[in-house]
């Protein structure tokens, strides 16, 4: 009885997977894959289309579609929402009205990279979300018989008192997935300071305002039978030091002390 039940379950599960695959947008047409490593607006010109394998001869730009869900990590909980298939992105194509992809025509689309920032309106801060599996996000281009999804023109914003924005808050992160203390799980750290006890990180801040405030968040961990500390130096200043308590480094079930 147990063997019969298991066989029926496996057949049902296999049919479910097959049904999902056959309904995917990828099941029909020719698809061309490309990657991005950051979030922003990207430009695709005629040369790039040719480089990824798309023939631009007799190409009607109105029939171009771009699909992709961004590069953020999938939810951990099965109950959380996730797209079951690739979603079409609204794009803008310069010069598509004549039905020909000319040399000066190009595509603009907004792509989400593998890493992201999550804003908190209550604390007026942002938290960095690192994709621990990939430093690239992938998108797909296809050409079909139907018109692609396009960016719609929004209604103009009329303001009696226009504001000129001259400054903004810049967010920069440095995170390398190099060290896993227990060689298990998804908790990774960067440089190992056991031997080379100093490391230098250069963060690019272009056109930074002099004497403007800076907020720094640093995470670290130690496994040591004695108390240890990690000092953080910003330019020539020493803003703070992490003090780590001792842990039983010889135990098979040892833990680690961390700050972040």
Question: Language-model segments: what does each one mean?
Answer:
Residues 20-37, 52-260:
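Structured catalytic cores of large enzymes
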Residues 40-44:
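Ligand-binding face of N-terminal immunoglobulin V-set domains in extracellular IgSF glycoproteins
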Residues 1-22:
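Bacterial Sec-dependent N-terminal signal peptides
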